[in-house]
């Protein structure tokens, strides 16, 4: 009787691409020795739609509906960066009330994004129950979005110089009720997840990134803060009105998948704290800067003179971008979302470069999964939190 021969050659496995509603159309070519990962090559581009080139053939107003398709789970941030770029370029001031409304919407969107990270991440680890729990709170956030913007997703709410509409009557009370309810929900998540020995076994020490590595790879967001680097653009750049609220940067020093989970859970608590303070301090006044609603053909134009044309209802579609360049960034749920904008005295941007956080954070994946087990790939990929819409653009 001859003994069965054992093969020593490596095995190549294709993981993905999956449907965009799941982890997105990401393909991983994984080289395995048994269950040990020898190499991993991400294949990108399945969801590429030419978002940068579209921007260079549209006015900013025309382009606004497109941007919600980058990160379609945190659409307020893509809208914010799209209007912030021309606002900084032309030095447009926004009313204080509009700034507070923006902060409230951004933090609600951050919570919604982190919730839809938490559910699938736990499902990847084999815990299906939290996936159903997170939709409870997420639907309440979408109810708030629908009441304020008319849309549950793809809100199209931000405008150059402010927001599209003021908060409706009774919205603030509903938002405060949600904040009180959600804090109890976070405690429930922690009781359900954090003490689970199977969960801890799957995430502790898995996907370790040191602080130096995180900086060298250009990581941002929870990926960076989980490695001991206290860097949050809301504190660094002081955009909108974040400097008027009392909150702390959430960080961990361990640098593994568990640390990234803890950072995101803590960030949701801080977001609630910011929302409550913003609602308490929100001033009256206009929700949009009427100065944006005019053509400014001459830099020295004065009120009501011949050069000063006032438009009635909407910002001018002929909003010209002056000949200069700048880089603007916001702290999105996944990291630093930036726009490099070059204007040339025309209606369209000459260059519109998107700096997506997911694309940069994904680059470290092959290094993290090497010498790990095959089952750890989904743990590490889930802890990075990517949306292929913004990765491929």
Curated annotation (Swiss-Prot):
The keyword Cytoplasm does not apply. The keyword Membrane applies. It is an enzyme of class 7 (translocase). It catalyses: a plastoquinone + NADH + (n+1) H(+)(in) = a plastoquinol + NAD(+) + n H(+)(out); a plastoquinone + NADPH + (n+1) H(+)(in) = a plastoquinol + NADP(+) + n H(+)(out). Keywords: Chloroplast, Membrane, NAD, NADP, Plastid, Plastoquinone, Quinone, Thylakoid, Translocase, Transport. GO terms for molecular function: NAD binding; oxidoreductase activity, acting on NAD(P)H, quinone or similar compound as acceptor; quinone binding. It is found in: Plastid, Chloroplast thylakoid membrane. SUPFAM superfamilies: HydB/Nqo4-like (SSF56762). Transmembrane segments: none annotated. It comes from the Eukaryota. It holds the Pfam family Complex1_49kDa. GO terms for cellular component: chloroplast thylakoid membrane. It is a peripheral membrane protein. PROSITE patterns: COMPLEX1_49K. One of its GO terms (biological process) is photosynthesis, light reaction. Its EC number is 7.1.1.-. Gene3D superfamilies: Cytochrome-c3 Hydrogenase, chain B. Belongs to the complex I 49 kDa subunit family. NDH is composed of at least 16 different subunits, 5 of which are encoded in the nucleus. HAMAP family: NDH1_NuoD (MF_01358). NDH shuttles electrons from NAD(P)H:plastoquinone, via FMN and iron-sulfur (Fe-S) centers, to quinones in the photosynthetic chain and possibly in a chloroplast respiratory chain. The immediate electron acceptor for the enzyme in this species is believed to be plastoquinone. Couples the redox reaction to proton translocation, and thus conserves the redox energy in a proton gradient. This is NAD(P)H-quinone oxidoreductase subunit H, chloroplastic. It comes from Lolium perenne.
């Amino acid at each position: 009787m001859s003994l069965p021969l054992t093969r020593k050659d490596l095995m190549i496995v294709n993981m993905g691409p999956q449907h965009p509603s799941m982890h997105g159309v990401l393909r991983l070519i994984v080289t395995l020795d048994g269950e040990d990962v020898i190499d991993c090559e991400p294949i990108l581009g399945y969801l590429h739609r030419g978002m940068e080139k579209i921007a260079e053939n549209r006015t900013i107003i025309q382009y606004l509906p497109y941007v919600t398709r980058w990160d379609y789970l945190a659409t307020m941030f893509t809208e914010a960066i799209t209007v912030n770029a021309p606002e900084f370029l032309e030095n447009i001031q926004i009313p204080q009330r509009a700034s507070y409304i923006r902060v409230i919407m951004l933090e609600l969107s951050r919570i919604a994004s982190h919730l839809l990270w938490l559910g699938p991440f736990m499902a990847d680890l084999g815990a299906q129950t939290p996936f159903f729990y997170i939709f409870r709170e997420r639907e309440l956030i979408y109810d708030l979005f629908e009441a304020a913007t008319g849309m549950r997703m793809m809100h199209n709410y931000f405008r150059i110089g402010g927001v599209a509409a003021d908060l409706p009557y009774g919205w603030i009370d509903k938002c405060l009720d949600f904040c009180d309810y959600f804090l109890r929900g976070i405690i429930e998540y922690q009781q359900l997840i954090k003490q689970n020995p199977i969960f801890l076994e799957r995430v502790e020490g898995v996907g370790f990134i040191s602080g130096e590595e995180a900086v060298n790879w250009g990581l941002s967001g929870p990926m960076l803060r989980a490695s001991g680097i206290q860097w949050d653009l809301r504190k660094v750049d002081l955009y909108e009105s974040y400097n008027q609220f009392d909150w702390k940067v959430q960080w961990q020093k361990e640098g593994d998948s568990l640390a990234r989970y803890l950072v995101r859970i803590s960030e949701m608590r801080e977001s609630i704290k910011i929302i409550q303070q913003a609602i308490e301090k929100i001033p009256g006044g206009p929700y949009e800067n009427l100065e944006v609603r005019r053509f400014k053909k001459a830099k020295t134009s004065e009120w009501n003179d011949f050069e000063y044309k006032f438009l009635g209802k909407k910002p001018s579609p002929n909003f010209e971008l002056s000949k200069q360049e700048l880089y603007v960034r916001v702290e999105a749920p996944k990291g630093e979302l930036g726009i490099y904008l070059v204007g040339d005295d025309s209606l369209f941007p000459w260059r519109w470069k998107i700096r997506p956080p997911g694309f940069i954070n994904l680059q470290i994946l092959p290094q993290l999964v090497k010498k790990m087990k095959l089952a750890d790939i989904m743990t590490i990929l889930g802890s990075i939190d990517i949306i292929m819409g913004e990765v491929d653009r």
